[in-house]
Swiss-Prot record:
GO cellular component entries: plasma membrane
Keyword annotations from UniProtKB, A to Z: ATP-binding, Cell inner membrane, Cell membrane, Ion transport, Membrane, Nucleotide-binding, Potassium, Potassium transport, Transmembrane, Transmembrane helix, Transport
Lineage, broadest ranks: Bacteria, Pseudomonadati, Pseudomonadota, Alphaproteobacteria, Hyphomicrobiales
PANTHER family in alphabetical order: POTASSIUM-TRANSPORTING ATPASE C CHAIN (PTHR30042), POTASSIUM-TRANSPORTING ATPASE KDPC SUBUNIT (PTHR30042:SF2)
Gene from which this protein is expressed: kdpC
Species this protein is from: Parvibaculum lavamentivorans (strain DS-1 / DSM 13023 / NCIMB 13966)
Protein name in UniProt: Potassium-transporting ATPase KdpC subunit
Pfam families attached to this UniProt entry: KdpC
Length: 187
């Protein structure tokens, strides 16, 4: 019986250290070293209301906004993941055709592949700078802004995630759309 009680104490101590202690330590390190990321990288509107996260894509469909990559999970953060469909699936091909048609792509003006294909998690908040520039004319026209100004805003918000290791610069779609809203209200 004595060894049984010792075993229970050991299990309790191990759980306390490994579950509660480790979790608390990781949480504390996150709060100190990366408080924004630890809190979900939330983005708030001017009135302080949280409107999204810089780490999760949102579905923008109005022509006045830049559109993110397609999502196999309908931009639902709780169900992140791919569609698990084969690249030869007719569903995938049909969705790609619909997306290409939605953008009005032609043989002379082909759609960047990333804008027709969902990311692995279905929640990628970024598109390439090239993908954003592809949409600039539509967004500028819908907002009544000069295309050069919209393109300048894209370049301003583009960043290289891996410095010299990443071939393409990326743009966060939500942050770019919010910047456009600020430009529109200021102008």
């Amino acid at each position: 019986m004595e060894s049984f009680i010792a075993s229970i104490r050991l299990v309790a101590a191990t759980m306390l250290i490994c579950v509660a202690g480790y979790s608390a330590a990781v949480w504390a390190v996150g709060q100190v070293l990366m408080p924004g990321s630890a809190q979900g990288s939330l983005i708030a509107a001017a009135d302080g209301k949280v409107i999204g996260s810089s780490q999760v894509a949102q579905n923008f469909t109005e022509p006045r906004y830049f559109w993110p990559r397609p999502s196999a999970v309908d931009y639902n953060g709780a169900g992140a993941g791919g569609s698990n469909k084969s690249p030869t699936s007719t569903d995938i091909a049909d969705r790609a055709r619909e997306t290409v048609a939605r953008y009005g792509a032609t043989a002379e003006n082909p759609l960047p592949a990333e804008l027709a294909a969902a990311s692995g998690a279905g929640l990628d908040p970024h598109i390439s700078e090239r993908g954003a520039l592809y949409q600039a004319a539509r967004v500028a026209q819908a907002r009544g802004l000069p295309q050069a100004g919209v393109e300048a805003l894209i370049h301003e918000h583009a960043f290289a995630p891996g410095a010299f290791l990443a071939p393409d610069r990326l743009v966060n779609v939500l942050e770019l759309n919010l910047a456009l809203d600020r430009v529109e209200t200021a102008g």
